[in-house]
Swiss-Prot record:
Lineage of origin: Bacteria, Bacillati, Bacillota, Bacilli, Lactobacillales
Organism: Streptococcus pneumoniae serotype 4 (strain ATCC BAA-334 / TIGR4)
GO biological process: one example: double-strand break repair
UniProt-recorded name of the protein: DNA replication and repair protein RecF
InterPro entries given in the database record: DNA-binding_RecF (IPR001238), DNA-binding_RecF_CS (IPR018078), P-loop_NTPase (IPR027417), RecF/RecN/SMC_N (IPR003395), RecF_2 (IPR042174)
Function: The RecF protein is involved in DNA metabolism; it is required for DNA replication and normal SOS inducibility. RecF binds preferentially to single-stranded, linear DNA. It also seems to bind ATP.
PROSITE patterns hit by this protein: RECF_1 (PS00617), RECF_2 (PS00618)
Protein family according to the UniProt entry: Belongs to the RecF family.
A GO CC term attached to the entry: cytoplasm
Gene3D superfamilies: P-loop containing nucleotide triphosphate hydrolases, RecF/RecN/SMC, N-terminal domain
Xref: Pfam families: SMC_N
Residues that, per the record, bind ATP: 30-37
SUPFAM superfamilies, alphabetized: P-loop containing nucleoside triphosphate hydrolases (SSF52540)
Length: 365
């Protein structure tokens, strides 16, 4: 798939911009704070209805406006798909083929993206919430039912936590009803995640072995607050975990176990990767990103769109060449950079856009 056209209206520092893209490589060139990353963020937001930089949607709206509008035309094997997002103070409206979508799971997945940015190194050493978000964003694109199950789980979780905080006297029967619903959707979420991690590890192990000159083996482990060793009895394991945590939950007035507390760990040759060198971290994250691309292709039969936010200068020659191999294949790529000096080996079929003060101008093909 590839993004043919993008229209931005009052998004970040873009007042109104319309731009047509190259199906292969697109380079956003400009000084810092001109809007290069904002352009990538717009593409990411159009795909996922979420920003990778802020949790507060109103930060995306131009400072003197009350709403924003994004639209794009995605080309896929099955034809063209127009996508639209309108964000106001009241919320967001999403449209596919000009038809309003009632649920997030009905919208996400029509345009798949893989983002690689310097902050992705936090995937290794950052907080567990960063890794959970990574799973949610990637898995949600290839398996829409996951977003539906996750939304339902979070709804029940919020209900349970609110009840724990507000109830003067706990009704054990009512709490058990909430627990049953939490277990139902929680097990679905965990099963989706376990399947995803297994596939990601398979692709990632191969990529990392190549990047490390056949000396490092990558493995990924899903760390759960629930006993996940026996998937057939996952529901029973979750119930037992909730029962054991009930006294703690009543005291702290929140839910201590479940997929909202889970994490993933990365290992290099059996050792915790968080203790590795910065070079190993870069290789590991690059391996994961390249694995994401192959995983998405294997499931959707479409190549995702690759977004590279100022990462080429962060990579050594070996890692750059590996990334360029991927770019040279049939995958649309967007790169932000302040200079073309370290992009000498890029494919010839590319478009360069100069970004200045929230405006984009084509200056090379």
């Amino acid at each position: 798939m590839w993004l043919q056209h993008l229209s931005l209206k009052t998004f970040r520092n873009y007042k109104e911009t319309k731009i047509d893209f190259n199906p292969k490589l697109n380079v956003f060139l400009g000084r810092n704070a001109q809007g290069k990353t904002n352009m990538l963020e717009a593409i990411y937001f159009l795909a996922l209805t979420r920003s990778h930089r802020t949790r507060t949607d109103k930060n995306l709206i131009h400072f003197d406006e009350e709403q924003l509008h994004l639209s794009g035309l995605v080309q896929k094997k099955t034809g063209s798909i127009p996508l639209e997002i309108e964000l106001t103070q009241k919320g967001r409206v999403t449209k596919v083929n000009h038809l309003k979508q009632a649920r997030l799971s009905d919208y996400v997945g029509h345009m798949n993206v893989v983002l690689f940015a310097p902050e992705d190194l936090q995937l290794i050493k950052g907080a567990p919430s960063i890794r959970r978000k990574f799973i949610d964003m990637e898995l949600g694109q290839i398996k829409p039912i996951y977003l539906s199950d996750l939304t339902n789980y979070n709804h029940i979780l919020k209900q349970r936590n609110t009840y724990l905080k507000s109830a003067q006297k706990i009704d054990e029967t009512f709490l058990s009803v909430l627990d049953d619903q939490l277990v139902d959707y929680g097990c679905r979420v965990m099963n989706h995640r376990l399947d995803f991690i297994k596939k990601l590890e398979s692709f990632g192990r191969k990529k990392h072995f190549e990047l490390s000159n056949q000396i490092e083996e990558l493995s990924i482990s899903y760390q759960s607050s629930v006993n996940i060793t026996d998937k057939q009895n996952l529901s029973e394991s979750f119930k037992i975990a909730l029962e054991k945590s009930r006294s703690r939950d009543l005291f702290k007035k929140n839910t201590g176990v479940g997929p909202h507390r889970d994490d993933i760990s990365f290992y290099i040759n059996g050792m915790d990767a968080s203790f590795g060198s910065q070079g190993q971290h870069r290789s590991l994250v690059l391996s994961i990103k390249l694995a994401e691309i192959e995983l998405m292709e294997s499931i959707t039969t479409e190549s995702p769109i690759l977004l590279l936010d100022d990462v080429m200068s962060e990579l050594d020659n070996t890692r750059q060449l590996k990334l360029l191999e991927t770019i040279s294949q049939s995958i649309q790529t967007f790169i932000t950079t302040t200079s073309l000096d370290h992009l000498q080996n890029l494919p010839e079929n590319l478009s360069i856009f100069t970004i200045q003060d929230g405006k984009a101008a084509v200056n090379g093909n």
